[in-house]
Amino acid sequence: MKTRGFSFPRQRQVLFLFLFWGVSLAGSGFGRYSVTEETEKGSFVVNLAKDLGLAEGKLAARGTRVVSDDNKQYLLLDSHTGNLLTNEKLDREKLCGPKEPCMLYFQILMDDPFQIYRAELRVRDINDHSPVFRHKEMVLKISENTAEGTAFRLERAQDPDEGHNSIQNYTISPNSFFHIKISGSDEGMIYPELVLDKALDREEQEELSLTLTALDGGSPSRSGTSTIRIVVLDVNDNAPQFAQALYETQAPENSPVGSRIVKVSAGDADSGVNAEVSYSFFDASEDILTTFQINPSSGEIFLRELLDYELVNSYKRNIQAMDGGGLSARCTVLIKVLDSNDNPPELIISSLSNSVAENSPGIVLAVFKIKDRDSGENGKTICYVQDNLPFFLKPSVDNFYILMTEGALDRESKAEYNITITVTDLGTPRLKTEHSITLQVSDVNDNAPAFTQTSYTLFVRENNSPALHVGSVSPTDGDSGTNAQVTYSLLPPQDPHLPLASLVSINADNGHLFALRSLDYEALQAFEFRVGATDRGSPALSSEALVRVLVLDANDNSPFVLYPLQNGSAPCTELVPRAAEPGYLVTKVVAVDGDSGQNAWLSYQLLKATEPGLFGVWAHNGEVRTARLLSERDAAKHRLVVLVKDNGEPPRSATATLHVLLVDGFSQPYLPLPEAAPAQAQADSLTVYLVVALASVSSLFLLSVLLFVAVRLCRRSRAASVGRCSVPEGPFPGHLVDVSGTGTLFQSYQYEVCLTGGSETGEFKFLKPITRHLPPHRVGKEIEENSTLHNSFGFNY
């Protein structure tokens, strides 16, 4: 059965080794600086602006920042002055330990264009530590037969300082048996050796006490002391002997605590107590004693705490074997730590932008560095982002990567991206690190306001109250923030005569439209204008829509009676012969209404009458006709009030007053009609025109009557008595009462008229009618027509 290997996306993968190939962006360089340890925070290191050859203020303009390899801010950059300062008090011994020189590596990152400058800071040592012996007392067991010149290696003192400030010399207190000899080691350290100058005699002196002093090279010099107690032993002929001078072994860094690392073994040719060998670390440092422990009887070395290849990859120390007689031997143990894939890759963000403007391709979003503390295949890494996102990774120097936009983004399509940067090593098992970035796409004003309709139709009933809200326009804008805030305005009308500014207004913030004044349907039925919507982006975008306003008619005009004229002058009097048949047309009431539609539909009805049932009014055309045959008992004078009503809601009405005079002969005296009370009415321009027209017609009519009377007077041969006048002959004007032009009055009726002498009121009297002598067939026909009229007409009583 095959086991499939770990797979990764083929795109956007970046494989690199810690031995970087030198891929770099333009402008990369290398700088070396130094600072003394223990300097105060804010101490000056260098002026980067001058060192990089940049003008003042350029560092700030390019967003310069300092990033260290271990992501700790040891340094602080003042981008305005260009000074690089210490961000904390630096302790060389804590930062680097025994390593010399002590170097801190960092990078200087700049944008526009993006550049990386590599740099290093050396922390110079000062003599701030004194030499210290691990043991305040050292015990040496020396046989009394030890030859002169024999050297005994002593434990060296520890001094964290380096270079000239480290231990430079050892001295011994004055005595007659020993002196100090300085010897070096492969690691560059010096060790004190105690050299025997004079043979010891146990019988004379069993013990000696000496003081060992370690001196460093600082100024002033520092020192540390330890007491050496020498025990003089009886003769021990053989010292222990190790099987190997060098024990070399390997230990995986993930070895558990308590694991046996190696076993050393020494033999002694003596017997008894002198052959009993014990093992110990010789001149061991603190890290050896905390990491390993040795069994003094068996020589087995065990792991005391976990190993870390990334901290220490090997240990080399001396093991001492001492017999019971005080003789000793030493061997060297070299422990090599084997790397295991126990460290996931590290992703260190140097700069990050959580927002990017849409329509901006090739923008740097993040700069980060990848580290893997493992080695070999365990330290090789793959870095990638999701395939379905418009972003890519670009490698730079020193394991730096740049996250950039691949193309233009569209906020209206997607306003937020969750980007996951994944770094995986190639070790076994493979370890990975993920870092998520939430990116907000900021808006660019790339969408103009869009109206939901290209045109709007609004309806406003006339006689509205001023400042009435008549409607709204509501465009949408795909942008956000200020780019989506819309301001409304009225555009200049195409009709220059339209007083748009006095008709409507628009709320600039919400698009509400208001009628500024009361509209009159009779003056303005409809008008149109354009509304503009402009956003507050930069540059601003706009659109427009057409608005049509239709004024709805209200029943605000009462009917106006054109005939008979109701203007307060002498009332109109209609003459009706008593011989008139039912349905005889007396007159026609003519009225108009300034409204439209059903508000202008007029109906007529008889509101009041002197004698109900005698006259009727046609409901649809206002014709006043007789409803029955007239009799001698009917009064001669009649007053009719006709109601003219429109079809509005509520309906409006007007009245017309008619005076009807029944005549049947000229012998009857004239009864003066009562004067009509002048009506108070406001005449508009139409009324004036109608009055002028009626006055002209009346003048012509009066002139005709006078001519008619004169002719009749001339023809009469007999003198008239008092109150009487000659009966004229000839036709009576047919248009006297039928102002509507229907011509329905019988032409067979004619009247004699005479003016009374001295009359100041201009009254005229109607006398008896003169009936023409018609042919018999014509009279019968007229009677038949009158009978038909009586039966076929309908009336309102």
Curated annotation (Swiss-Prot):
Topology, Cytoplasmic side: 712-797
Subcellular location: Cell membrane
One Gene Ontology MF term: calcium ion binding
Superkingdom, taxonomy of origin: Eukaryota
Glycosylated residues in this chain: 169, 418, 567
Pfam families with a match to the protein in the record: Cadherin, Cadherin_2, Cadherin_C_2
KW Zinc (keyword) present: no
Spans through the membrane: 691-711
Cadherin domain segment(s): 35-133, 138-242, 247-347, 352-451, 456-561, 568-671
Membrane topology value: Single-pass type I membrane protein
UniProt cross-references to CDD domains, sorted A to Z: Cadherin_repeat (cd11304)
PROSITE patterns: CADHERIN_1 (PS00232), CADHERIN_2 (PS50268)
Role description: Potential calcium-dependent cell-adhesion protein. May be involved in the establishment and maintenance of specific neuronal connections in the brain.
Protein name: Protocadherin beta-9
Lineage: Eukaryota, Metazoa, Chordata, Craniata, Vertebrata
